Swiss-Prot record:
Locations listed in the record: Cytoplasm
Function: Catalyzes the formation of S-adenosylmethionine (AdoMet) from methionine and ATP. The overall synthetic reaction is composed of two sequential steps, AdoMet formation and the subsequent tripolyphosphate hydrolysis which occurs prior to release of AdoMet from the enzyme.
Entry protein name: S-adenosylmethionine synthase
UniProt-listed InterPro entries: ADOMET_SYNTHASE_CS, S-AdoMet_synt_C, S-AdoMet_synt_central, S-AdoMet_synt_N, S-AdoMet_synthetase, S-AdoMet_synthetase_sfam
EC identifiers of the protein: 2.5.1.6
Pathway named in the protein's UniProt entry: Amino-acid biosynthesis; S-adenosyl-L-methionine biosynthesis; S-adenosyl-L-methionine from L-methionine: step 1/1
UniProt catalytic activity: L-methionine + ATP + H2O = S-adenosyl-L-methionine + phosphate + diphosphate
Gene: metK
Single GO cellular component term: cytoplasm
Cofactor binding: number and manner: Binds 2 divalent ions per subunit.
The species this protein was found in: Polynucleobacter asymbioticus (strain DSM 18221 / CIP 109841 / QLW-P1DMWA-1)
Molecular functions (GO terms): ATP binding; magnesium ion binding; methionine adenosyltransferase activity
Broad class of the protein's primary localization: cytoplasm
UniProt xrefs under SUPFAM superfamilies: S-adenosylmethionine synthetase
Keyword Transferase: yes
């Protein structure tokens, strides 16, 4: 029974203050890339009660109204009323961007080890992961957590539950048997709400309208512990309830804790930053390995040195699920995927304004047309090369 256990992941809605910051950072990145695809962008955002601060390093010839981009993002999320914690119309927006350091630029613009390529924008380690728990090849707990807060947003936006406000969090605990999802044990959903709604009415509506439609029937075995707004009240939320910062939801953004994380956040960073682009490439590799049937679970670690194009290491682990050895899979990866920064950008077509959409509800496991790292177009070649 050593392989029977409980595992939990969480997600947050687009109105969570840290996600507000992520979305503003990525909206600014998109606005710049739309005019200047080779810009260098590291856009950080802080949001608090009535205040947005934009800081970081940007080198570009694009002409972007950063303040208006921030306000538009708040409006699109739903922060159009001071009662919600911040109002796009009246909040203060402070801008404090510098240019990228020339000491960094000289190693990124031209690699020290490869005259035809750009170097990595920083040192670091990144992970990619995929498993066969869902059709999207994602771990089930983070998949369900994302779907719950997505549904909260959907019912808020279409007016079916018009007392919902933008800020919300979800958490799902699954029981695993023999290493596979067996049943849902606990679902937590906390949502910001209007003052007038009673807790009893709120809990009933959240369970029946938000939670139950999301849960897969095959994972419902016996009573589920539903915890809805367990504090009893969640009127004050968003940037008023907590200060939001870019890059503070890196586990929500990735695999919900089911795989390691190298520590680098994604939002606000252009694709020369391997924190983002190599993590996307890692997901692309791992997903294609699993889609090819080479393993039911795949983890890849990639590492880089600043100014150097070629990865300093590539590691593959299939946790004993591989049809061929991990070493052979690693060899196939090196033969089929260009993991140099410029190779990744070309392979995944990353110099496009596609990032705002990634900044809420997960960067992975969403088969959006722009999310090239979710494609499984290399699976057939991997399978053939493996002789399966």
């Amino acid at each position: 029974m050593a392989n029977d256990y409980f595992f939990t992941s969480e997600s947050v809605s687009e109105g969570h203050p840290d996600k507000v910051a992520d979305q503003i950072s990525d909206a600014i990145l998109d606005a710049i890339l739309a005019q200047d695809p080779t810009a260098r962008v590291a856009a950080e955002t802080l949001c608090n009660t009535g205040l947005v601060v934009l800081a970081g390093e940007i080198t570009t010839h694009a002409n972007v109204d950063y303040i208006q981009v921030a306000r538009n993002t708040l409006r699109e999320i739903g922060y159009d009323n001071t009662d919600y914690g911040i109002d796009y119309k009246g909040c203060a927006v402070l801008v404090a961007y510098d240019k990228q350091s020339p000491d960094i630029a000289q190693g990124v613009d031209k690699a020290h080890d490869d005259g035809l390529d750009q170097g990595a924008g920083d040192q670091g380690l990144m992970f990619g992961y995929a498993c066969d728990e869902t059709s999207e090849l994602m771990p089930m707990p983070i998949h369900l957590s994302h779907r719950l807060v997505e549904r909260q947003s959907q019912l808020r936006r279409d007016g079916r539950l018009n007392w919902l406000r933008p800020d919300a969090k979800s958490q799902v605990t699954l029981r695993y048997v023999d290493g596979k999802p067996d049943s849902i044990d606990t679902v937590v959903l906390s949502t910001q709400h209007d003052e007038e709604i009673s807790l009893e009415k709120l809990r009933e509506a959240v369970i029946e309208e938000i939670i139950k439609p999301v849960l897969p029937k095959h994972l419902i075995k016996g009573a589920i512990n539903f915890l809805v707004n367990p504090t009893g009240r969640f009127v004050i939320g968003g940037p008023q309830g907590d200060c939001g910062l870019t890059g503070r939801k890196i586990i929500v953004d990735t695999y919900g804790g089911a795989a390691p994380h190298g520590g680098g956040a994604f939002s606000g960073k252009d694709p020369s930053k391997v924190d983002r682009s190599a993590a996307y490439a890692g997901r692309y590799v791992a997903k294609n390995v699993v889609a090819a049937g080479l393993a039911s679970k795949c983890l890849i670690q990639i590492s880089y040195a600043i100014g150097v194009a070629k990865p300093t290491s590539v590691m593959v682990s299939t946790f004993g699920t591989g049809k061929i050895s991990d070493e052979k899979i690693a060899q196939l990866v090196s033969e089929n995927f260009d993991l140099r920064p410029k190779g990744i950008v070309k392979m995944l077509n990353l110099l496009r304004p596609i990032y705002r959409k990634t900044a809420a509800y997960g960067h992975f496991g969403r088969e959006e047309p722009e999310f090239t790292w979710e494609q499984t177009d290399k699976a057939a070649a991997l399978r053939a090369a493996a002789g399966l």
